[in-house]
Amino acid sequence: MVYVLLAPGFEESEAVVPTDLLRQAGLETALVSLSGPTVSGSHGITLCADLELSQVDLSNAEMLVLPGGLGGVEALWADDRVSALIQEAAGKGVWLAALCAAPILLGRWGLLDGRKATSYPTRHGQLGKAEVLPEARAVSDGKFVTGHACGSAFDFGLKLVEVLRGEEAARAVNDV
């Protein structure tokens, strides 16, 4: 199961595009709200969540995805349950993926230290001790995937498919 964590103010395309590509690849993917059945993004688009945060089960998790959108990122940061979940997931070897502004969360938690990563350009300095690849659209290093910005949502989503199901699966989704 892939869990996409949504907090109020998330960037809609950064949640929807990767979710769509993951589902096209046959990966069970759930949109997860911090609370309540719906979550509104930074541009006023409201999504229906499949689950609430309390229903995330790391025993069946392949990956946790953190979309950007500064409001959503700050809401994720402010929720101690999210920090605990991410730390536990990292300890269990669950893939962690973050796009645009969201990699700063992984940086704040020290999870990118010594790893290659990217993020929204004005956030590069907030990636902890990561080796920043400023021109990269999507980067995987260990069990971490980071993405550049909203415009790289497709590249990021395809990278998620690639790390979970292989290059052939990513090519197949790209060719749909």
What are these regions (language model features)?
Residues M1-F10, R23-L34, L51-E52, V56-V176:
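Active-site-adjacent pocket-lining segments in enzyme domains
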